[in-house]
């Protein structure tokens, strides 16, 4: 085969992923406009961003679709750290810091996002669910009615980030003293 033959061949198409594409389609049918964005890595992983008001409905839809294992639930503060990165050289002047927020796979529009990982143990497929949490209303609906195991995850997220969970029966602190002020995992 000559170099000319190689240059004229069409590039190979990326493989499809019918299983994960089907999950996206089913969730879109269930929550409609509540599905905001997706990031599919064929035959590897799936990230889905939903609207804040569709957070619990998305969990219920995925649970009904066979996602029987609740892995974790937490939040992330996408604000760039005012202290730099841990690998910055302390002997050098500090690098210029950016204030641009980058939300990772499936995008985002707010500083805080909820993250949760669910797995369908029969089909051996997982999905990471994300939801933007508006700065002026730091709360989402609790997942306890859908996944009872979300209880302490939500308590920890509330304690560390200050995000509320509508319908949660008991948002007492787990780690910090009752009189502790502030939220340790916020970057401000």
Residue ranges of predicted features:
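Terminal low-complexity/charged segments
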Residues: 1-188
């Amino acid at each position: 085969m000559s170099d000319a033959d190689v240059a004229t061949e069409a590039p190979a198409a990326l493989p499809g992923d019918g299983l994960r594409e089907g999950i996206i389609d089913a969730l879109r049918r269930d929550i409609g406009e509540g599905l905001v964005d997706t990031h599919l890595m064929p035959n590897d992983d799936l990230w889905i961003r939903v609207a804040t008001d569709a957070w619990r409905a998305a969990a219920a839809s995925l649970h009904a679709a066979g996602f029987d294992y609740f892995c974790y639930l937490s939040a992330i503060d996408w604000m760039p750290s005012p202290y730099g990165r841990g690998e910055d050289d302390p002997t050098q002047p500090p690098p210029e810091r950016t204030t641009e927020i980058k939300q990772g796979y499936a995008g985002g529009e707010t500083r805080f996002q909820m993250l949760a990982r669910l797995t369908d143990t029969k089909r051996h497929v997982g999905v990471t669910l994300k939801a933007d949490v508006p700065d002026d209303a730091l709360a989402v609906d609790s997942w306890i009615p859908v996944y009872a195991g979300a209880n302490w995850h939500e308590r920890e997220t509330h304690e560390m980030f200050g995000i509320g969970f509508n319908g949660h029966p008991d948002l007492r602190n787990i780690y910090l003293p009752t009189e502790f002020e502030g939220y340790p995992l916020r970057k401000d």
